[in-house]
Every structure is written in C-alpha cells, then in structure tokens.
Regions:
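Basic side chains
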Residues: 5, 12-14, 84, 121, ...
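Extended, leucine-rich alpha-helical cores of fungal transcription factors
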Residues: 1-9, 21, 184-192, 196
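C-terminal substrate/ligand-recognition segments
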Residues: 128-220
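Long hydrophobic alpha-helices with heptad-repeat/coiled-coil character
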Residues: 4-18, 206-221
Length: 221
C-alpha cells in the first residue's frame, strides 16, 4: 500500500508510454530506461498463475509480480460493491448475495474471439460457459451461450433481455460467502507484466530489437 521507488518507476513507465498523447512528443527511450531499472533489479517476476494477482487474500510472499497495490479488507476498508458490478442482472444465484447484481461491462464477440485456442487467460478473465452454485458444484446457475453476433447469458425462467448479454469480467476471485457485495481483493495498480509489455512496445515503436520485444511478450503469453 505504500509507494516506493519501484512504484514510482512503474508510474513513470506508464506516463512515458503515453507521453505523446499528453505532450505531442514521444518518450520511447525513457520507457525503456525506466522499465529496465525495474527489470534489472531482479526483485520482480511474473506470478506462477495469472489468477494469483487477483486473489481474495493476496499472498505477497509468493507473488512477486505486483509492484504496487491498493489494499482492501472487508472488515476495515472494503473494495465496496465490486461483486455486484460484473455478473448479469438476472444472476442473483451466483453466490450468497442478498440482492441482485448490476450487470456491468462485458466483452463483445470480436474481443473474445481474439483469444487463441487454449489461452488460459480467457477462462481466468471472463465468466464464460457454465457457472455452478457456489455450494453445489453440480447445479448450473448460469450458462453463457454464443449466439453471434451477441454473446447471450441465459438462465431458464429468468429475464434474458439485452441487459443480461455478454461475457462479464471474472478475473478477480469472488468471495462467495459475502452477503453485501463487498470484498477484500487488493487492487493491483502496477504489475510486472505491464512493465514487460511497455518495454516491448517502446522497442517496436522505435524500430529496435524486435526479437527482444518478442521475447518479452512471450514471457507473458
């Protein structure tokens, strides 16, 4: 929760990456410079599992990918109402909630289809396919079915209008026991993966070291 040198460098990397948008002058070399300071420190590395970055109880002793996170705790400072944001409105059976979800933002088919077959990030980022009752793994409470050009989430006997369509964000681990929609997941503001991707983009924007850029991206893929 405390900003330090590495969080500051991560912030600079992000600012330099977008410098041309803000000032009209690109700063690709500075992106590489600040990113290299983080990379060469040897402190950070990608988490073994992508989902580790969004767990209810972040284990920072084993997760070296998160450079800076905003801490949240259901008892002292909860990440308020986030559980309600993502699932479709009709799906109030997803957990131990006492009211309905809000049916927040969702992905369109073109974005979902951009994932390559077998890419685990799809299932770890989006609520897709059959979803089961949190206490009964055999009870299907929600199923996403691909009815192009819309991705429709349907449940028998419930409202299946447009407000319930689309794949919802599911990368943050759900606390199925909460009754309020609040959670304790820390918000990972700067991650090592972003630094690798930023350096790769900066190299390509300068027409340099395409092989190095490919290696950086491949670490994440």
């Amino acid at each position: 929760g405390r900003m330090n040198k590495w969080a500051a460098l991560a912030c600079l990397t992000r600012v330099y990456l977008n410098a041309e948008v803000y000032t009209g002058t690109a700063q690709w070399a500075k992106v590489v410079e600040t990113a290299d300071q983080i990379i060469n420190s040897g402190i950070f590395e990608l988490a073994p599992d992508y989902s580790d970055n969004f767990a209810v109880d972040m284990d920072y002793s084993n997760n070296k990918e998160v450079i800076f996170a905003v801490p949240y705790d259901m008892q002292y400072a909860a990440f308020g109402q986030q559980h309600k944001w993502y699932p479709p409105v009709a799906n109030n059976h997803f957990g131990n909630f006492k009211d309905y979800f809000w049916g927040g933002s969702c992905a369109n088919p073109q974005f979902i289809n951009a994932y390559e077959p077998g890419d685990k990030r799809l299932e770890k980022t989006w609520l897709t396919g059959k979803r089961y009752h949190y206490q009964n793994p055999e009870e299907v409470v929600w199923e996403c079915i691909n009815y192009l050009p819309s991705l429709t989430c349907m449940r028998d006997g419930e409202n299946n209008t447009n407000i319930n369509w689309g794949y919802r964000v599911g990368k943050y681990e759900y606390n199925y026991e909460t009754t309020t929609g609040q959670w304790s997941n820390d918000f990972a503001y700067f991650r090592y993966a972003e630094i690798l991707m930023s350096k790769a983009e900066a190299l390509l924007r300068q027409g340099k070291d395409e092989d190095v850029a490919a290696q950086l991206v491949s670490q994440i893929r």
